[in-house]
């Protein structure tokens, strides 16, 4: 029994760990409709430990200080500790601090062997239905996580330090005014208050001041507080999904492997990563335009760990949403610039227009604006309510309008517009002065998930390069858009009020919207064609087998995905089919669940249009192959057989080839299921069939798998080598399966140099390999090292593979093999 020497301290240390489990998907409570009570997360933990829920509540002080026990059974205590350390990001310091409140001996600084010995005492309900200690492999995984960053411990190749910040570029060269508001933000950063909300009308500069405050923390650490990381998330472009929100945070914290995970897993991991990184210094999380974001984002913010400071901007006042959760929060209501700052902003904006203008008449009008009387400037500032965006739009309008500036200022003053009416007036007058091409650009801005570049925006609007640049120059001169140079190309950023006004006009132009969306979609079809299509093989589907440089596709992926989603939602079947045909193989390295989802939708679309061969491709390879990769063998078999049935009625050129591949895939599926005889029967039936090199390559790989499964390793090597030689006739594939299986076969034959060479063939760029490549590489090297007798290195390499599997796709088919090797290395120690 463990005696609790300091019961209060023990409860205070244990409680946060237990409560953190409440958010974990394994313990999250799901009550049925109209059900008054249900199993709580503590009930689930209690079941796993074999104690009552009240026992756990007493341990964490939830029933009062008098009910905290004086002693706890070692197995139960370490069982509780095991669950917390396995499911959360709590570190070794938490464990030592907790145990110091007991009579259990503590080694400081902690050592891996000591931590492992503690966890071996845990008694939990295991998967086999018996109470006992976790497996050796499970304990080793947790211990490696606890000590991964200690000197002498090799770190995971994919573990990254948090990026300092991801702030966008400043919109203006010099920030003017707002000294009182800036000081209020600085004081909030230094205070215990977790949330600061900046509200104000559109165009007041909420984004600008939030950005300036963030840059102040980066540039001037002597006055502004230092943060471990500053994370900027913007909902400005067409709203912000919860998944995008979590992805951004995960990426900035060096957890990019979480990007393709389920929402529940990602939510839990991201929250714990935030807690982990805030132990030394706080993190500043800035969410721009929070009022347009999904409700889940609001809920996530209200449960952030201590040490995360959240700066929000919103047009609407959402104070009540957060006040109920935080009690104390800082709220800053931005009003217009004061007279002095507004005068300075006026001068700066006019000078900026002069620098970008080379038209004599327009320059003359701008010069006149510089010399307006103070009274006229004051009248102008009053009419625009000191709103920076309204002032910029007005200056751009006055410099181009035939009406004298003085007259327009008087008209604005007399009209007494509200700010909303003023924007309508300014956008309306600006719209009237825009030429047709500029209006086209303006209306198509709303198509994009991320700011477009010249080619995509021009294509959507239907403009050639000359007309695009003329229209873009007009948009710039009217202060509607801001070019930003990033990653070697120019993107065009627009304020959300500008995008919304263009979308409003687009909704009234049904014919133009139809044409523009069609151009937009076909631009991205052509984009995928350009960046994915190979010269060989010549096929409607196999031509898009992956090359190796996917940077261009990844840059535009958010916008491509938006086209796919639009095509699916609006039943643009032809467009969906063309896109999925091109990106199916790309999705195998980006997101297998998306490949499955849209592969099925594309198959349904092809079925509706009578495109039988395309439907078969989508069912057999796009969906069937991917389902097999995530170990859904029943789902894979269903799709493959549906595709084969379709091909019975097709005499298309590709149909025979695809039919052979469908049968070979079935054989591969039976091999995965341990049914070697069924697999062999199918392979014998399709033997010596006249097929293309692309399919021949794949069939030989499956034949190699059968030989390998039967222990005929030399024969397997011959088949794998033959498959790779055939693929070289059409440019090669360098598929992971081909080189991984070849490498393992060489390991079995003790040809270690050739094995290592084969494994390295999977990594096109060793320094920038993706997760799935690294999973197979580390597992292959683990087998090689184990065969050579280098047991310690083998275990380390295998653990890397397991960690990558957990973070990329836990259901990936190879997982069982990797775990079997982990058990084998333990048994032979």
From Swiss-Prot:
UniProt record, GO biological process: defense response to virus
UniProt binding sites for ATP: 200-207
InterPro entries named among the record's database cross-references: AAA+_ATPase, NB-ARC, P-loop_NTPase, TPR-like_helical_dom_sf, TPR_rpt
Residues annotated to bind DNA: 42-61
Ranges for the TPR repeats: 697-730, 736-769, 775-808
Gene assigned in the entry: gutR
Coiled-coil parts of chain: none
GO cellular component, one term: cytosol
Lineage: Bacteria, Bacillati, Bacillota, Bacilli, Bacillales
Keyword entries, A-Z: Activator, ATP-binding, DNA-binding, Nucleotide-binding, Repeat, TPR repeat, Transcription, Transcription regulation
GO molecular function, one term: ATP binding
Protein name in the entry: Transcription activator GutR
Reported function: Activator of the glucitol dehydrogenase gene (gutB).
